[in-house]
Amino acid sequence: MDTQNDVIMAISQVTEELAKSKFVVGAKQLKKALKNGNARRVFLACNADPAITEPIAALCQQYHVDLAWVRSMNDLGHACGIEVGAAAAAAID
């Protein structure tokens, strides 16, 4: 994450956006949604392994999909309504 160019999104905003839409959780499902053109916005956890987040961030840039960072995997998991942390999630069409 390049903190000079990226903004950490408030978890309340993430929760609200995900509650209003369909979404996928996890790197594999998210990459599939990006490649199929279904992802509207991607959420990545700042404390997730860069081996997971960096390829997804690159795909977001390639497919011109908005990317938002969330402070932690626990926060992102909570926003998705799951009991474990999540490295990545996406609002989909």
Name each model-derived stretch.
Residues D2-N38:
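Ribosome large-subunit tunnel/peptidyl-transferase-proximal elements
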Residues A27-K28, C46-N47, I92-D93:
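Fold-independent oxyanion-binding glycine-rich loops
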Residues Q29, R40, C80, V84:
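Short, flexible micro-motifs
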Residues A58-D93:
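Short basic, glycine-rich beta-strand/loop surfaces that mediate nucleic-acid
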Residues G26-A27, I52, S72:
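Amphipathic coiled-coil/heptad-repeat helices and related helical stalk/stem segments
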Residues K32-A57, H64:
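N-terminal positively charged helical leader segments and presequences
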Residues S12, E16, S21, P50, ...:
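Flexible, active-site-adjacent loop/turn segments at secondary-structure boundaries
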